[in-house]
Amino acid sequence: MVQVAVMGAGSWGTTVAKVFADAGNEVRLWARRAEVAEDVRDNHRNSAYLGDIELPAALTGTTDPAEALNGAEIVVLGVPSQSLRENLQNWKDLIGPDASLVSLAKGIEHSSGLRMSQLVSEVADVPSERVAVLTGPNLAREVAQGQPAATVVACTDMDRAKLIQAAVAAPYFRPYTNTDVIGCEIAGTCKNVIALAAGIAAGMGFGDNTAATVITRGLAETTRLALEVGADARTLSGLAGMGDLVATCTSTLSRNRRFGEHLGKGETLEQAAASTKGQVAEGVVSSQSVFELAEKVGVETPITEAVVGVCHEGADVQQIMMGLLGRSKKAE
């Protein structure tokens, strides 16, 4: 049994906390809002994010970071990518000297260009081999319901990856290890952007052929970028690559896809956010960071560029989609 702290009580953070508890560990879930922590602690629910799904008794909630992190051997970071730095600065002195840090966030920090594992290592002042990422085709509600799923625990230290793998292996949740942190993080970031594009296409009324094209060409540009920055090509065809991409681009549970659908129907960013519980999808923020990284290393990412045009430059979705199809012809 391992002592686990999960910092962030959104839908995915709460779900991961549930998985660790179902795997036989004691878990403390830190929530920013008192009513969420109380719901988890007193009712074994997170009604705000997971409805009536019952949470295990081994999982408790708190709003006190010190209480959550006290004695934690595994610290799971479940806050959004663009607020991770600020939160981690507040928590870093409370994290044990030998604790493993696991990032759930998928993104590239816009101000620095850092991947999330790099940001965690820098801000918490820990060596990179103590930082892992958990990523894969893991839609929170399905996992929280106990539906079978697999994931990837990526860490440059394979022994540490195996320790985390053992701790998070629940009867319905199968973790695989990988040492390609770069590939897993680039894939996890880009898939949100591609899912926006898939949603835009669906919102415009296009069908399965278009969806398959967006997904496949999205994987192609993700792979080009990932390889250019040092990833292993095999990662892109695995759970953290193709698996996560397919789930996020096709599922009605995917916030990025749903957000894209609203954009495809002609809504503004503000209207789309209002239609999706007031949240701007992660892919909107990530699209700029991904495009800037791609330009920096000289990689062509036309789908990402199109998403940037729609989300940040006021481009018309019809013109953008037709522009993608009208690009100069080339070999696949």
UniProtKB/Swiss-Prot annotation:
SUPFAM superfamilies: 6-phosphogluconate dehydrogenase C-terminal domain-like, NAD(P)-binding Rossmann-fold domains. The active site is at K191 (proton acceptor). Its EC number is 1.1.1.94. One of its GO terms (cellular component) is cytosol. NADPH binds at S11, W12, R32, R33, K106, A140, R255, V280, E282. GO terms for biological process: carbohydrate metabolic process; glycerol-3-phosphate biosynthetic process; glycerol-3-phosphate catabolic process; glycerophospholipid metabolic process; phospholipid biosynthetic process. Sn-glycerol 3-phosphate binds at K106, G136, K191, D244, S254, R255, N256. Belongs to the NAD-dependent glycerol-3-phosphate dehydrogenase family. Catalyzes the reduction of the glycolytic intermediate dihydroxyacetone phosphate (DHAP) to sn-glycerol 3-phosphate (G3P), the key precursor for phospholipid synthesis. This is Glycerol-3-phosphate dehydrogenase [NAD(P)+]. It comes from Corynebacterium jeikeium (strain K411).
